[in-house]
Amino acid sequence: MQSMPNHAPSITPIKADLMVCPRWIIPVEPAGVVLEDHALIINSGEIVDLLPREAAAQRYVADTIETLPEHVLIPGLINTHTHAGMTLMRGIADDQPLKTWLEEWIWPLESRWVSTEMVRDGTLLACAEMLLSGVTTFNDMYFFPEAAAEAVDQSGIRASLGILAFDVPTAYGHGADDYLTRGLATRDALRNHPRLSFMLAPHAPYTVSDATFDKVATLAAQTGLGIHIHAHETQHEVDDSLHQYGERPLERLERLGILGPQTLAVHAVALNDADITLMAKHNVQVAHCPVANLKLGSGIARTTALNAAGINIGIGTDGAAGNNRLDLLSETRLAGLLAKGTQQDPGLFPAHSLIYMATLGGARALGLQDQIGSLTIGKRADLCAIALDNATTLPVFDPASQIIHAAGREHVTHVWVDGQCVVKKKHLTEISHGEIYAKAKTWENRFRG
């Protein structure tokens, strides 16, 4: 008997821009998951699928296939606090207390040199360093955000830029009203940029008046913008606030309507139990900057207590002028080690929770959790590939632990932002080394003069 021919219709493969095939994928959502031999599918800058590699090869045909046989793929890292333009001041006045560092070194230097050119050049240098370190998004607080936006546009990184409020005149503006007006105008001009968002950025309780905070609170309510502010960075700041206002900085911010789930409190080192309760009450976010806190002698943030209170924590580097590095992987590792050591509990902040803080926790802190922070279908394709085939990372029993405790930024090989490859085989694709080297040397000579 003759068999009948099989007339089952063949399935037409789905076209995509990019298929990334690493050995391991840590999607962050769902929590604690490590996928082996899977593929991530990207089209038009969006994650469209995550599935086993064999199924991906049958279902999709991609313009580019990136095979990374000994790599782990994670969401791009998110730096929740920095001053990118200050990267040109890296190493100036090291080993000084924060107040001395600011008032006797940084602010005088800024008063002479801060400009659109300085901010653009410094931010481009910062973008280069962050991209090579696996950072795909940074949250900035500095002057001339329009100049920072030029560097963001050139480099291909994603950024949340600060609309500064500061009750001191500078080359950028005559005072807080001028800063806010200029910052809002920049935001309006760039509102359609696919990789830019904005936050209101009153500098700190000790540099911003009650009247300015009232304006910031009103603007936040009107625009829906988040608020990015230094808070409780040192005990000196708390003591000065008690002397001047009769209340702790967070108490004052609550009175002025600044605290809320849209508020990102940077550093949050000098906290007592009542402060943490107050932050939890208002669902305040925290940008934890452990290296800067240690280097400037500010102290060690109570991250264990913050975490226990349900407060979301993202990781930040602060500026390279105070930290000297924009290295989020080392920052994240230190955050975990400080918690374990100070609490004498090795079980605190396991590797997956630290990766969360450096990715989705950061996205939540910036109000961008629906767009970035995890390798989830429908989110933007911001990705970081880390090679684990080096003598310093072998053998690999747990890729998540290896990222935190063995790997470093030197193991980052590929980075994508919005589906575009901005670091390929450890080389920047949008920024030339010669350009940033020349700009950095020019500013070094100016500052020395």
Where do the protein language model's features map onto the residues?
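Active-site microenvironment of metallo-dependent hydrolases
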Residues: 1-38, 42-44, 48, 59, ...
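Divalent metal-coordination and catalytic microenvironments
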Residues: 23, 40, 45, 70, ...
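Alpha-helical scaffold segments that flank or form the walls of functional sites
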Residues: 72, 90-156, 179-192, 441-449
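Active-site gating loops and adjacent loop-to-helix segments of metal-dependent hydrolytic enzymes
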Residues: 88-121, 155-177, 235-262, 282-285, ...
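Active-site glycine- and acidic-residue-rich loops that bind
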Residues: 139-142, 199-215, 294-297, 365-367
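Metal-coordinating catalytic core of metallo-dependent amide/deamination hydrolases
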Residues: 147-269
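His/Asp/Glu-enriched, well-ordered alpha-helical/loop segment
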Residues: 255-262, 304-390, 406-407
